[in-house]
Curated annotation (Swiss-Prot):
Subunit details: Homodimer.
Record GO terms (molecular function): 4 iron, 4 sulfur cluster binding; iron ion binding
NCBIfam families in the record: PRK11190.1, YhgI_GntY
Biological process, per Gene Ontology: iron-sulfur cluster assembly; protein maturation
Binding-site list for [4Fe-4S] cluster: 149, 152
Organism taxonomic ancestry: Bacteria, Pseudomonadati, Pseudomonadota, Gammaproteobacteria, Alteromonadales
Cofactor details (free text): Binds 1 [4Fe-4S] cluster per subunit. The cluster is presumably bound at the interface of two monomers.
InterPro entries, per the entry: Fe/S_biogenesis_protein_NfuA, FeS_biogenesis, FSCA_dom_sf, HesB-like_dom_sf, NIF_FeS_clus_asmbl_NifU_C
Record-given protein name: Fe/S biogenesis protein NfuA
Family as reported in the entry's similarity comment: Belongs to the NfuA family.
Amino acid sequence: MISISDSAQAHFVKLLADQPAGTHIRVFVISPGTSQAECGVSYCPPDAVESDDVELEFNGFNAMVDAKSVAYLEDASIDFVTDQLGSQLTLKAPNAKMRKVSGDAPLVERIEYVIQSEINPQLASHGGNIMLVEVTDDGVAVLQFGGGCNGCSQVDITLKDGIEKQLLDLFTGELTGVRDVTDHQPGAHSYT
């Protein structure tokens, strides 16, 4: 479910050494399954352990996960990285905003999962996003751009060289193309 690197495990052991006996760490997702999902790690004293928590055992400590966060922390990883700028704990949870879908799920659900877990996080760096409007009977994914992508001068390149290529590679034989139906209105919101 959650992988924790050796360096992160050592970091947690060091932090927990200064806490009361029996304190664990808690890994959680606030607003799981939504675009506002936020992941975090905190101390979990013994009296904060719930009966339905999932307990994960690591070397020198245990990690507690509340029942509603479990599915959204599938394939999550925690690392502790040190570089010239200092040290940083990173938590990556690709399924926090949307549950991972099975390979035999309907095409619309699988496309939506890729959009939410892979494409929109990339577009977010420019303040943008896309939404799947529909998949036509002839296999065209109809998309609508929002945020900084609406009116962006590079939207055609993003669509054809990025999004379409990625989706066609992932859904070969099921998807035949993508089409943008956004009424692009360049403005202060547009990424330039």
